[in-house]
Amino acid sequence: MSFDIAKYPTLALVDSTQELRLLPKESLPKLCDELRRYLLDSVSRSSGHFASGLGTVELTVALHYVYNTPFDQLIWDVGHQAYPHKILTGRRDKIGTIRQKGGLHPFPWRGESEYDVLSVGHSSTSISAGIGIAVAAEKEGKDRRTVCVIGDGAITAGMAFEAMNHAGDIRPDMLVILNDNEMSISENVGALNNHLARLLSGKLYSSLREGGKKVFSGVPPIKELLKRTEEHIKGMVVPGTLFEELGFNYIGPVDGHDVMGLISTLKNMRDLKGPQFLHIMTKKGRGYEPAEKDPITFHAVPKFDPSSGCLPKSSGGLPGYSKIFGDWLCETAAKDSKLMAITPAMREGSGMVEFSRKFPDRYFDVAIAEQHAVTFAAGLAIGGYKPVVAIYSTFLQRAYDQVIHDVAIQKLPVMFAIDRAGIVGADGQTHQGAFDLSYLRCIPDMVIMTPSDENECRQMLFTGYHYNDGPTAVRYPRGNAQGVALTPLEKLPIGKGLVKRHGEKLAILNFGTLMPEAAKVAEALNATLVDMRFVKPLDDTLILEMAAQHDALVTLEENAIMGGAGSGVNEVLMAHRKPVPVLNIGLPDFFIPQGTQEEARAELGLDAAGIEAKIKAWLA
């Protein structure tokens, strides 16, 4: 998509924040309008995160207009809302390449631009990093400002409160902006969001308070009286003003779509000392009515026709693994009232919408709180229930201690349904599910299963759910299933693999859904093919049998080679003094950038041609 100067005459003048700050203030509303239209035109042609960016146009313009970026440091939490930021910071003409192989990174990324102070992708990290950056700036002595923008979904995470508690203690000069659009990826839940709703009733209190401070600030006795009166008013109007109790000077809420008002407020706050908190109200999907009405559907979009007002329907192909899980969950819950399902704010992505509607009293969206999700599940298990934690591989990393300390050590029957395992694709380095086998395999008493297709996935979910001697994990990928027939549910024998094809000299031990590629390679090389099924416990007997019957072994997995399933096979062979050559094929020792899943697998040699080439080169 080439940039149309005639269509965007004001935006054409802005290819850097320095150019933005040269614009007359009265032209900024027009700039916002053009920026929003350009975002719609670009993302509808290329795909990407959509509704969040539409809601932050005015805020982005105001921040870069008031602050001397990149000298002043602007930090975006998660980064879904940062597309306007990228457009205004020299990446306007490349925005159509976002999330594509070799294109712009899907989130703010330090290696891409000096304006991207913090690389992000996971939520709730901005305030912690911002405090560190603000402290460093203070010690540097260059009067550099620090601003963090965090959403109402991300601020529900415990890490954000840990950071604010620390900021209130050491009092760095920084500004935290809460972008309150009343909508994160899933519906926001929890007491904090109820509290934010209560804050909306405090506009009169906020204006009276700030006005009174200005009028009476020079009169000490009245100033002290105002402070005492304020404490009483605070208790009556806004019970427990949370952010001020944490040590922040709270201002707001203010209209996040009034660019002139935002500029005025930010200028007033820019030179204030200590931790400042600005609460702005925005509308996710602002300016595009279909996204305003359905911001969840329009959170991330494929290519679509903006004039149609709707996203293209799926071609009616095979169901995704998330739906396979969701269907199994509903089927099992209908038969067992003990099932409890937990998600950390990923209802739609994890395939749990139908379950949440059919079984609302057994569905728990704990918000962006992975640590709490796991220990909450532990408590349910202690209480005699059967918790299923549906979580993306990349987000389970955030609750690792809870998996060990609160679940595994106590041998509690918690099942982890690990979605987005392996290569995820367009979201890049921060979202690849590359490490779960490695970080779970070393936990004692953990049972880990890797299905090769959707039927095996269902059987493993059934097996894990009915396993009562400790935690279990079933990991499955993003994307569509393979179209195999679904058979009646039955428990699989724990730790047993299956030989799928008998060959000569070479045996391929496959873990997971690369099985179709492995089957092609086995056929081409006349190799034995094994569906290992279990990463833990491994089928030691079968591994030793394969070692005895073949000249060499190949392990195949879509997980980091280091510490993964293949490493487990190596350990078995060494423990039994079997010096059989083994080639471990999996994800390499670097963070895998964005691109389609197919592009990544081809580049990494994890398609059939690449796997065959790796094996032939190794055997040569």
Swiss-Prot record:
Signal peptide: none annotated. The keyword Transferase applies. Its cofactor is Mg(2+); thiamine diphosphate. Keywords: Isoprene biosynthesis, Magnesium, Metal-binding, Thiamine biosynthesis, Thiamine pyrophosphate, Transferase. GO terms for biological process: 1-deoxy-D-xylulose 5-phosphate biosynthetic process; isopentenyl diphosphate biosynthetic process, methylerythritol 4-phosphate pathway; terpenoid biosynthetic process; thiamine biosynthetic process. Mg(2+) binds at residues 152, 181. It holds the Pfam family Transket_pyr. One of its GO terms (cellular component) is cytosol. Thiamine diphosphate binds at residues 80, 121-123, 153-154, 181, 288, 370. It comes from the Bacteria. It catalyses: D-glyceraldehyde 3-phosphate + pyruvate + H(+) = 1-deoxy-D-xylulose 5-phosphate + CO2. Binds 1 Mg(2+) ion per subunit. Binds 1 thiamine pyrophosphate per subunit. SUPFAM superfamilies: Thiamin diphosphate-binding fold (THDP-binding) (SSF52518), TK C-terminal domain-like (SSF52922). Its EC number is 2.2.1.7. Pathway: Metabolic intermediate biosynthesis; 1-deoxy-D-xylulose 5-phosphate biosynthesis; 1-deoxy-D-xylulose 5-phosphate from D-glyceraldehyde 3-phosphate and pyruvate: step 1/1. GO terms for molecular function: 1-deoxy-D-xylulose-5-phosphate synthase activity; magnesium ion binding; thiamine pyrophosphate binding. The keyword Ribosomal protein does not apply. HAMAP family: DXP_synth. Homodimer. Belongs to the transketolase family. DXPS subfamily. Catalyzes the acyloin condensation reaction between C atoms 2 and 3 of pyruvate and glyceraldehyde 3-phosphate to yield 1-deoxy-D-xylulose-5-phosphate (DXP). This is 1-deoxy-D-xylulose-5-phosphate synthase. It comes from Salmonella typhi.
